[in-house]
Amino acid sequence: EPTPLHDTPPTVFFEVTKPIEVPKTKPCSQLILQHDFAYTYGQAPVFANYTPPSDCPSQTFSTIVLEWKATCRRRQFDRIFGVWLGGVEILRSCTAEPRPNGIVWTVEKDITRYYSLLKSNQTLAVYLGNLIDKTYTGIYHVNISLHFYPAKEKLNSFQQKLDNLASGYHSWADLILPISRNLPLNDGLWFEVQNSNDTELKEFKIPQNAYRAVLEVYVSFHENDEFWYSNLPNEYIAANNLSGTPGNGPFREVVVSLDGEVVGAVWPFTVIFTGGINPLLWRPITAIGSFDLPTYDIEITPFLGKILDGKSHKFGFNVTNALNVWYVDANLHLWLDKQSTKTEGKLSKHSSLPLVVSLVSDFKGLNGTFLTRTSRSVSSTGWVKSSYGNITTRSIQDFYYSNSMVLGKDGNMQIVNQKIIFNDSVYINLPSSYVHSLTSHKTFPLYLYTDFLGQGNGTYLLITNVDLGFIEKKSGLGFSNSSLRNLRSAEGNMVVKNNLVVSGLESTQQIYRYDGGKFCYFRNISSSNYTILYDKVGSKCNKKSLSNLDFVLSRLWPFGARMNFAGLRFT
């Protein structure tokens, strides 16, 4: 006898990532918000008052964790959402798509870098634009909690000690300014970039005793640009008289300006949301970055000399080749000289060369091949004089992009092979003539294949293969070097009728490896049709096992000539 639906336990959805390193101390926990998100689209964010924990035995914390826990049942689209504290965004995420029996998922994020913000009373704002109608009836039931882990006594003096310069580069910022939209809003606090000519601006003013500044950028892409990496060149669209087909080609970048001058860029990781391409591929293991979208840091320190005048200045956000819509905002992290009321500085060198673009098209009718290549470099050098002495900072961003696209079967089959290389380097020349460095080398490979087979009566079969990777190496500033290789391969098919999935099959494998020197984490997991086939987890930094894993990874990636899609999205 079949089990009644209401007796079936909800399915647990999750994103594969390393656990947060927390001390063995017992955390002080607070439930900040409990809310049911029903019809919330176009309405004001949900608000809650945040007060720092007062009943903890220690008021010095080594780690602070935000926990988002949600449940939902029946049918609903994936929904993008954001969490802001005092206008500062602390989480960008996507909901999971529910099942009739219900789902539950948890997102945990280390938010210790927002420590200074969490020391005072703030307003928490959450925007999750959900729609309810006769078909889509799922309500998201959400709890948001904060967990404060007291530092061990041995760490207290180090955590609080900001009287030496190096600590300013190891610790969190003294002040964080929101570079987001001001309330009240019937939307999220993010800026909405609608097209390539749209530059969103935010005015700000900083204290005159800052000696370091970092801009943390949040970005997500939606509607006509949700699948920007598969968008077609305009010449192909025009030649074939296509309408309603997203264009402007497959390259996008977020360009950040300060008072009209380019200070950096973001070439974003290709996050695939839980309803993206083929929703079945992301159940119950969601795509890389979908539950906790990555953020991107741009070193602003070389430009401090331009904004330490006590006057208002403007950050601008523009997206190259953008279609509607991109959600972008940022947080300006500032380190302040506690021994001085005024620092001074100067930008001594700055170079931001125009974007280099190469597009080669070869098509006949609806079939063809396209190769897009781009590169960009942004570098800046500046000094700041504070009570620590004269510090010179040099920041370099180098970007490389390649996208190979094939269209066949009269445009019903699409293959995309894309790679983004995103390198950041920061060099800090201290008064002692010692040079600190911070480097991050990221590689984002993507392979997509889709084949659309019409079957009449509003029904079609969609065959998909997706290979996705997030690879990063970090080093510098006294921290142990770290490396991350997060690789996902998925394939499946689904039958869609009147824009609703009626059946389908999927299988997926993901290999996650993080090596932080003292802390390591490895996970090899596979699923098929909601069932976990195997799940192998390890946490030892074993060089021999890592070398064996490299062999496994080399066989898994890069994938052979496989197969993308034409911007289809269903639930």
From Swiss-Prot:
Reactions accelerated catalytically: Hydrolysis of an N(4)-(acetyl-beta-D-glucosaminyl)asparagine residue in which the glucosamine residue may be further glycosylated, to yield a (substituted) N-acetyl-beta-D-glucosaminylamine and a peptide containing an aspartate residue
User: Could you state a single Gene Ontology molecular function term?
Assistant: peptide-N4-(N-acetyl-beta-glucosaminyl)asparagine amidase activity
UniProt PTM: Is highly glycosylated and is largly resistant against self-deglycosylation.
Q: What is its EC number?
A: 3.5.1.52
The record, for InterPro entries, names: PNGase_A (IPR021102), PNGaseA_N (IPR056948)
Going by the record, the broad EC class of this enzyme is hydrolase
Q: What is this protein called?
A: Peptide-N4-(N-acetyl-beta-glucosaminyl)asparagine amidase A
Q: What is the lineage of its organism?
A: Eukaryota, Viridiplantae, Streptophyta, Embryophyta, Tracheophyta
